[in-house]
Amino acid sequence: MKIFLYNCFILILLPAMAVRIVFKSLKDKDYRKYFSHRLGIYKDIKSLNKPIWFHAVSLGEVISSKRIVSDLLKNNEVILTVSTPTGLREAKKIYGDNLTVVYSPWDLIFFVAKFFKKFNPVALIIFETEIWPSMIYVSSKNNIPIILSNARLSQTSFRSYMRFKFFVLDTLNKFSLILAQSDQHLDRFRRMGVPINKIKKVGSVKFDIKIKR
């Protein structure tokens, strides 16, 4: 029921989200380029062989996650999703043809399900604190590991999440593993109600992962 209400809310916002893209494209035409990706339509992208889905929202996260993504690429197919043109351009600049980079679908179950149908990812790694309920819900329904890497939870975000704990905790508990940046961030996730056995302090963006295919 909670995820249904959330999707109804996002559906109401959809026209405004589309208008926002139009206005932003006046300054940066790449906002409207590949617009179909935001709807979960990737006809211009070739299918992959059970890739790891790595989500880094924007330019800063793309740069910070370079070490992890490069390590993953050594032994895995990876698809990187971003939300901004600057992130898209930087990722293409860094990885070239070695990595598939696309816009992430808007956070509606229908759009995310279309992404899964196209790419069939075997794991989802979200960088830092991009907590998208539909993305995580559909991943959970597909029984794949969901990892929050380099996770941080500021005091401001913590207070906001606590106000909606009844909903946020449902999403957080779907993570298989949360790799926190520090003891402070780890403690905030714990106080949110995430089981302590799902949270680890790593202190670095580098980690090893093995995926069963």
Where are these regions (language model features)?
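Absolute protein N-terminus
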Residues: M1-K2, F164
